[in-house]
Amino acid sequence: MTTQGSGGPTEYVRFQAVTPNERGHFTGVFGLVNRLGRAGRLSDDQEHFRRENNAWYDLAYPDPSNVDPTVYDPAVNPTATAWFKPTATHLIERVDGYLEILAAHGVECRMVRSTDPGHVIYEDDVQVVVTRREPRPVG
């Protein structure tokens, strides 16, 4: 668990599907919208929004896989998920447009908060990427 400068625990933020995918993982908001885009299901305006805002996000913060190619490698980190730090308000605020697209297509997505989202495998100023903690045997 990481602590904020105020002394309290950091509450990380993630936007994800409400139901797990075929691998048992909860796809994040960007993955959900990108999947709709790749399937050709977005309107012209939605596709324009997706492309424009994906490009903005690409410039706004580091792609963890460019820093460490194994971060999202399913053979190495099959449960890797990204969480925003609460201080990344400029990134979190722009998620609303993605949520509107998902709602228009009947795709449920929720915001999840956690002070301990998992084992941190990558961290920068605005995000952490974590994997699920393995249960510890008792006894």
Positions of PLM-derived features:
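Long, contiguous N-terminal structural blocks used for assembly/anchoring
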Residues: 1-86
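Short, flexible coil/linker segments at or flanking structured domains
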Residues: 3, 90, 116-118
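Amphipathic alpha-helical interaction segments
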Residues: 64-65, 91, 106
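Acidic, proline/glycine-rich low-complexity IDRs
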Residues: 100-139
